[in-house]
Amino acid sequence: MALAATRAAQLTTTGLESLGWTDAEAAQVAAHAHVARVFAVHRSDIEVRGPQGLDRIDRATAGGLDGVAVGDWLELTDGGGVARILERRNAITRKAAGEHVHRQVLSANVDRLLIVTSCNQEFSLRRLERYLVLACDCDVTPEIVLTKADLTDQVAGYADQAASLLAGVPVHAVDARSAEQVGALVASLRLGETLALIGSSGVGKSTLGNAIGAPNLETGAIRKLDDKGRHTTTVRAMFPLPSGALLIDNPGIRELQLTDCERGISRVFADVLSLAERCQFQDCQHGAEPGCAVREAIADGRLPARRLESLQDLRTEQARNAEILESKRQRARDIGHKYRKLNWSKRAKRGQ
Ligand SMILES: Nc1nc2c(ncn2[C@@H]2O[C@H](COP(=O)(O)OP(=O)(O)OP(=O)(O)O)[C@@H](O)[C@H]2O)c(=O)[nH]1
Ligand SMILES: [Mg+2]
Ligand SMILES: [Zn+2]
């Protein structure tokens, strides 16, 4: 509750707008409906905040909270129960994870997704591309925050590489521990705007959160050997900032695998795909085919070869994950079918 008290103290405006309420939510409920926004999701309860302040809802007794995510809006019953989760404007949904493919909503109703990466061994264009695809696929505007700018004299090089991945993507290079260096980011924050931080463990998401005004997020040292973090943040939670914006700090992501993100891919790889439209063959694989506009662009330096490789790798990975997902669904269908058959034969035996 100490955490909840700190958050309560930080909220300066009590109106729903300060919690991120928009016309999209207003259109879904009656004018005097009771609503609250989800600030943290725990195993047994959730923390919500509405015009009346902070509250905790027990998941078992409330019901109706399956799949609830930080950032969701809830319509409450007169008795304080949960009537329903309002339709989301958008959701950062992780559709696949390593061997176990599943869908997981990381943050809901997000205005700005800050993809955090560091100027050290963690920096990877491939990884950044994945995060950008995820953001674009979820219809959220991405921004890149390059932390640990103080640890390199190559900041401009890192920033240029990051910016080259998606036309117009803002890149903020900072020492995330410095309130002064994050000043421009803070100045851009608006009342009721929801920001979410995602990235690997140890890149400085919580450090950045603290610098932009979140109340004392826990941070932890990284391993010297490989710059990997130790998964310090374990709970997804949202915090009001002094600027009036809301910040969702996420735990570090181990490995971001993608499936079913074709829309995101088509946006992030628009450069490769628009060249591909000019290939002589419609089904060109951009290998040895004659008249390949993609190969031509690579040969004369207009397109970095790694962009094509990235696109092809992501497509292969998507296809593999889609297969795993489909075989899981099939297995679930088979089990459901067997179960129904068993129940049916039991009832038949009992003569029901
Ligand atoms: N030098 C330097 N250190 C930083 C910077 N940002 C973060 N750190 C340090 O990096 C370590 C990890 O920072 P965290 O904020 O805990 O990282 P995180 O992304 O929240 O990690 P998880 O919660 O594990 O996902 C801490 O020791 C921070 O002090 C930076 O810009 N410069
Ligand atoms: Mg953290
Ligand atoms: Zn081609």
Predicted feature locations:
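Helix-rich effector regions associated with P-loop NTPase G domains
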Residues: 1-14, 32, 66-81, 85-112, ...
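Canonical P-loop GTPase G-domain recognition
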Residues: 141, 148-203
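Short aromatic-glycine-enriched beta-strand elements
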Residues: 44-48
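Short, charged beta-turn/beta-strand-edge "cap" motif at the junction between a beta-strand
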Residues: 78-82, 121, 201
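Beta-strand/loop nucleic-acid-binding surfaces
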Residues: 54-70
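Structural detector for short beta-strands of small beta-barrel domains
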Residues: 32-42
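Histidine-anchored nucleotide/phosphate-binding helix
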Residues: 126-136, 141
